[in-house]
């Protein structure tokens, strides 16, 4: 998987720890994109769109929360935004895969959903 597995954000509503987690997630996403471009790996447009969108989302959340960290009562908001970004990061991490044989980064093909059957 191109995106590394990082620990979840803190459970407590510690603003500084949440901001640090957002910075870590953003840096991981940027490093992954940089690694892909540096090693001339092929990346599908869909996978590139997901990674670039995640990078922008994490950057926006990181800057917004860092600017507002001195405001009182932002702990719950910062924690909520951080957990939202964590779930987005995990979704992107699970959907973007690296094929070593072809040296490509692409989206994972989902499993075929079985048609529900009813008992007569």
From Swiss-Prot:
Alphabetized UniProt keyword annotations: Early protein, Host-virus interaction, Inhibition of host mitotic exit by virus, Modulation of host cell cycle by virus
Biological process according to GO: symbiont-mediated perturbation of host exit from mitosis
Top-level taxon: Viruses
One Pfam family here: Adeno_E4
InterPro entries documented for this protein: M_adenovirusE4
Stated name of the protein: Probable early E4 13 kDa protein
